Amino acid sequence: MKAYLDLMQDVVDNGFDKGDRTGVGTRSVFGRQMRFNLQDGFPLVTTKKVHLRSIIYELLWFLKGSTDNTWLAERKVSIWNEWALENGDLGPIYGKQWRSWQCHDGRVIDQISEVIEQIRTKPNSRRLIVSAWNPAELPDESISPQDNVREGRMALAPCHCLFQFYVADGKLSCQLYQRSADLFLGVPFNIASYALLTHMIAQQCDLDVGEFVHTFGDCHLYRNHLTDDIVFEQLRREPRALPKLVIKRKPESIFGYELEDFEFEGYDPSPVIKAPIAI
């Protein structure tokens, strides 16, 4: 995962100091990319321990089409707690857009099912795309996430907003476009989540895995993470060997996976580094 540390160092060295929605402030760069050959190991950050249960459960939650934080909370996953209503509602975020995109003519599109069918039947298509960016349901930045949900909008605009698949030589690759990237807290989750999704869809489509390509718009470090015990502590650490992902069974569909289906052999990270969340 040297590419991840190199990007973090790039932001430290070359970033612009900017204000942001949260009021914390960031140092950011624009237009960067990382590439991971999934044949070389699973791209899980090793310079700090990453909470795998949260990553897996969140992805399964997206795939369920759920926008109810209660499902995550019942599994002791707290990553969405700050933005949800008391009843768990988060508005039409990722799960709804992936599984139930509402069209003006009344149709509802299950983008995940459609893209898997296209990978199977039209692997050379250049339209193997899933988008979470629905301008009609984006939040109003002048009010709170909770008030947005009450008005039928997303609690948060999607940060990882569009991904595309590519099939060649019997391998499935994925490119993610992430408009806004919290490099310290969010990006390790995002890398692992989309790499895992690529493995899952490849298995469902009887393909090997190729590359995961992670493309960024605004890639930033929050100012309160630019401290000796957070960002600079991570930069001092040496990356370790990547783990190997083992998927223990093949469910009948992409929607049948469970937490216990995934094992990450050889994951030996450095200790966790805690950091505050910008809300």
From Swiss-Prot:
It catalyses: dUMP + (6R)-5,10-methylene-5,6,7,8-tetrahydrofolate = 7,8-dihydrofolate + dTMP. Pfam families: Thymidylat_synt (PF00303). It is found in: Cytoplasm. GO terms for cellular component: cytosol. Pathway: Pyrimidine metabolism; dTTP biosynthesis. The keyword Amino-acid biosynthesis does not apply. Its EC number is 2.1.1.45. GO terms for molecular function: thymidylate synthase activity. It comes from the Bacteria. Gene3D superfamilies: Thymidylate synthase/dCMP hydroxymethylase domain. (6R)-5,10-methylene-5,6,7,8-tetrahydrofolate binds at residues 51, 182, 278. DUMP binds at residues 21, 126-127, 179-182, 190, 220-222. The active site is at residue 159. One of its GO terms (biological process) is dTMP biosynthetic process. Keywords: Cytoplasm, Methyltransferase, Nucleotide biosynthesis, Transferase. Homodimer. Catalyzes the reductive methylation of 2'-deoxyuridine-5'-monophosphate (dUMP) to 2'-deoxythymidine-5'-monophosphate (dTMP) while utilizing 5,10-methylenetetrahydrofolate (mTHF) as the methyl donor and reductant in the reaction, yielding dihydrofolate (DHF) as a by-product. This enzymatic reaction provides an intracellular de novo source of dTMP, an essential precursor for DNA biosynthesis. Belongs to the thymidylate synthase family. Bacterial-type ThyA subfamily. This is Thymidylate synthase. It comes from Marinobacter nauticus (strain ATCC 700491 / DSM 11845 / VT8). The gene is thyA.
